[in-house]
Amino acid sequence: MRHLFILVLFSSFLFSCTSQDVKVDAKKSQSHYNLGLELAQLNLFKNAVEEFDLAIQFNPEDPKIHRKKGILLFGMKNYEEARDSFQKTIELDPEDAQAHINLGMIHYTSGNKDEALKSWEYAIGLKPDDNDSKALNNIGNIYKSKNDLSKSIEYYQKAIAYEPSNSTYLNTLGDSYRLKGDLVKAEEILLNSLKVDTNGMLTHFNLGVLYQTEGKFKKAVDSFQKSLNINPYYTEAYYQLATSLLKTNNKESAKQSLEKAIQADPNNLKFQELYNKVLAS
């Protein structure tokens, strides 16, 4: 750590000159790039960005440096600069699929789902044989949010073809089948997801919602409780648990579940309304 600190001070002193004074030097660029990676691993993100900037000064045409810098800036929630870095990467290497995927994440985070969809669909078309499962899953998520369930299922299945044991992909696929009304298929896939990851919090939650839909409220209660055992801060699970408990005439437990939800999220009107109904009943 002391060695890294000295290197940071040294590089800041030695390379404080303007970019106009710097000539292309691939070796020096790589040295700063490597130091930036080390600093990022130590969570010294600001210092890491500075090293990536120095790496870019010495070799401004290297797309991987711009992409790495963009990823770091995205993690720091500096979305505008991250977008600029990914766009520069694409300018230097139009076939950098990961840069297109990352740019899509910027659009998605900014609420521009249509632009995100364009970026991701373009990315998966660049190299058909590459594992584009993340982009495919992201596309599925957008179609799911648009309630185009046939499309969402199509893309989730494509993602799973690359990673058949990815519990996240299985979970989203199963929930799409639930929303489409194919409850048997949904349960089969969600249970398979739990075989891959028994601690899949959202999978247990989605199973609970599935069992609610089927009117199997005791099984729903069990699933929501398992979800909360894994993540006791997932407030929606408390709410859904309470609704299922009420269906089994367990008013006191439902009240306690809602109290936990309200304690975690006191401004949630939905939680408060159901709680008031329970008290009044």
Residue locations for each model-derived region?
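N-terminal leader/linker segments that initiate helical-solenoid repeat arrays
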Residues: 16-67
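Register position in tetratricopeptide repeats
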Residues: 41-42, 75-76, 109-110, 145, ...
